[in-house]
């Protein structure tokens, strides 16, 4: 009986080692996913801010171009 328990014990230990490995991999994937989601939100926010600034600049340029075309002086 003692000889049969040894392989069983080995399988149990191997199973636990596999489960721990899977847990580590799963945890790492979750951390990467959380980071990527956070990075995505940060990039979207920054791009939205840049878009607003560019839109404001485009409007100012159009206004200045219109005044120059009409021959008005810029004051």
Swiss-Prot record:
Coiled-coil positions: 41-72
One GO CC term, this protein: cytoskeleton
GO terms assigned for molecular function: identical protein binding; protein-containing complex binding; small GTPase binding
Compartment(s) of residence: Cytoplasm, Cytoskeleton
Modified residues (N-acetylalanine): 2
Origin: domain of life: Eukaryota
Subunit structure as annotated in this protein's UniProt entry: Homotrimer when in free form. Directly interacts with WASF2. Component of the WAVE1 complex composed of ABI2, CYFIP1 or CYFIP2, BRK1, NCKAP1 and WASF1/WAVE1. Within the complex, a heterodimer containing NCKAP1 and CYFIP1 interacts with a heterotrimer formed by WAVE1, ABI2 and BRK1.
Name by which UniProt lists this protein: Protein BRICK1
Organism whose genome encodes this protein: Mus musculus
Lineage: Eukaryota, Metazoa, Chordata, Craniata, Vertebrata
